[in-house]
Amino acid sequence: MALSIKEDFSSAFAKNESAVNSSTFNNNMKTWKIQKRFQILYVFFFLLITGALFYYLIDNVLFPKNKKINEIMNTSKHVIIGFSIENSHDRIMKTVKQHRLKNYIKESLKFFKTGLTQKPHLGNAGDSVTLNDVANVMYYGEAQIGDNKQKFAFIFDTGSANLWVPSAQCNTIGCKTKNLYDSNKSKTYEKDGTKVEMNYVSGTVSGFFSKDIVTIANLSFPYKFIEVTDTNGFEPAYTLGQFDGIVGLGWKDLSIGSVDPVVVELKNQNKIEQAVFTFYLPFDDKHKGYLTIGGIEDRFYEGQLTYEKLNHDLYWQVDLDLHFGNLTVEKATAIVDSGTSSITAPTEFLNKFFEGLDVVKIPFLPLYITTCNNPKLPTLEFRSATNVYTLEPEYYLQQIFDFGISLCMVSIIPVDLNKNTFILGDPFMRKYFTVFDYDNHTVGFALAKKKL
């Protein structure tokens, strides 16, 4: 008897199909996960490359850094300190903006069109900027004191000769926002205690002498300095300034306590070979400068250095014949000063010089303005027996506004020291790389490189 057997494979086929589908799904999931990982890697590398490109553009194209100066600082056999510059132009513009004097100055500009200011009473005496605001320039650099290297921002000043810092014992208002020297935290501190007072054009500070290790760049040496405990006589300049103390780079005869200036003391202790320091102020960066101690870095200038003998070991001053347009002063005393932002001249001389030059004195402001392309402005000449130094208008003019016509501040201001005494400040030192030589009692000049 034949048997009829039927086998139902439908469930097997269904299971097999399910298995196949499951396997395909798993494979698809694995492929998707792999693709996902690669996509994440793609995004990562894309962001990395884009970020690197963006950084390159920022660092090298849009806001390029001066890598040349870093190379010079790293390879020089001398000590080079980079410092920041706060100049009078910045302070004046801040005051002008605070008191909304822009329109006031704009009206004064109409002198060039009408010979009269349209609104002579737009300003008032309360809006004034003091002469110190115009004359002073501050070079801020860092140094440390103590074996624990307490950091301070210093002004490098060729017009004084002592080093001072605010003391932890100072309770006056100006010290509240400053870095204070604490002798208790330094194991190398030596007590002196002699009380002193120092007088500056901007006021006075007082304190006492101390001795500790001072570190400038990579040079450390024991040095006698002043701990300042009272800054009230130095206000508001001290509170408003971005500095803690001052490093004097003048002559010993200027110092209180007959202390050798820092650079001379470095040579006394065989830390440097020459008692020499130099200033280089780049023409293309008004807020940076470089102080070299112990020698001359020839990569900062071009041509030959020429030297002038000092006429007195008090300030860095020399005898020069001055030619300002049609005016001449023979054997004038010219003080080369890192703390002055302008060329200064006696008031009587300057009034004569400005006659007929279309230069306007702004009422209530110690500010002289003119058009930036004023063809009447002459090249200034400073002559010694063997050398001639010139200063073109581009160096003593600073653009402040543009009203369709460019308006510049004239960086030549009246300061009455003596009848024939002039100060060669920032404009002169920006054109001429300047050498201050204690050993030979000279100052040297060479054309500063406009760009390294």
Curated annotation (Swiss-Prot):
<feature type="active site">
    <location>
        <position position="337"/>
    </location>
</feature>
<dbReference type="GO" id="GO:0005774">
    <property type="term" value="C:vacuolar membrane"/>
</dbReference>
<feature type="topological domain" description="Lumenal">
    <location>
        <begin position="59"/>
        <end position="452"/>
    </location>
</feature>
<dbReference type="InterPro" id="IPR034164">
    <property type="entry name" value="Pepsin-like_dom"/>
</dbReference>
<keyword id="KW-0645">Protease</keyword>
<keyword id="KW-0735">Signal-anchor</keyword>
<dbReference type="GO" id="GO:0020020">
    <property type="term" value="C:food vacuole"/>
</dbReference>
<keyword id="KW-0378">Hydrolase</keyword>
<dbReference type="InterPro" id="IPR033121">
    <property type="entry name" value="PEPTIDASE_A1"/>
</dbReference>
<comment type="function">
    <text>Digestion of host Hb is an essential step which provides the parasite with amino acids for protein synthesis, and regulates osmolarity.</text>
</comment>
<dbReference type="InterPro" id="IPR001969">
    <property type="entry name" value="Aspartic_peptidase_AS"/>
</dbReference>
<dbReference type="Pfam" id="PF00026">
    <property type="entry name" value="Asp"/>
</dbReference>
<feature type="transmembrane region" description="Helical; Signal-anchor for type II membrane protein">
    <location>
        <begin position="38"/>
        <end position="58"/>
    </location>
</feature>
<dbReference type="GO" id="GO:0031910">
    <property type="term" value="C:cytostome"/>
</dbReference>
<dbReference type="GO" id="GO:0005775">
    <property type="term" value="C:vacuolar lumen"/>
</dbReference>
<feature type="topological domain" description="Cytoplasmic">
    <location>
        <begin position="1"/>
        <end position="37"/>
    </location>
</feature>
<keyword id="KW-0472">Membrane</keyword>
<dbReference type="InterPro" id="IPR001461">
    <property type="entry name" value="Aspartic_peptidase_A1"/>
</dbReference>
<dbReference type="GO" id="GO:0006508">
    <property type="term" value="P:proteolysis"/>
</dbReference>
<dbReference type="GO" id="GO:0004190">
    <property type="term" value="F:aspartic-type endopeptidase activity"/>
</dbReference>
<keyword id="KW-0812">Transmembrane</keyword>
<feature type="active site">
    <location>
        <position position="157"/>
    </location>
</feature>
<keyword id="KW-0064">Aspartyl protease</keyword>
<feature type="disulfide bond">
    <location>
        <begin position="170"/>
        <end position="175"/>
    </location>
</feature>
<keyword id="KW-1133">Transmembrane helix</keyword>
<feature type="disulfide bond">
    <location>
        <begin position="372"/>
        <end position="408"/>
    </location>
</feature>
<feature type="propeptide">
    <location>
        <begin position="1"/>
        <end position="123"/>
    </location>
</feature>
<feature type="domain" description="Peptidase A1">
    <location>
        <begin position="139"/>
        <end position="446"/>
    </location>
</feature>
<comment type="similarity">
    <text>Belongs to the peptidase A1 family.</text>
</comment>
<keyword id="KW-0926">Vacuole</keyword>
<protein>
    <recommendedName>
        <fullName>Plasmepsin I</fullName>
        <ecNumber>3.4.23.38</ecNumber>
    </recommendedName>
</protein>
<keyword id="KW-1015">Disulfide bond</keyword>
<dbReference type="InterPro" id="IPR021109">
    <property type="entry name" value="Peptidase_aspartic_dom_sf"/>
</dbReference>
<dbReference type="GO" id="GO:0044002">
    <property type="term" value="P:acquisition of nutrients from host"/>
</dbReference>
<keyword id="KW-0865">Zymogen</keyword>
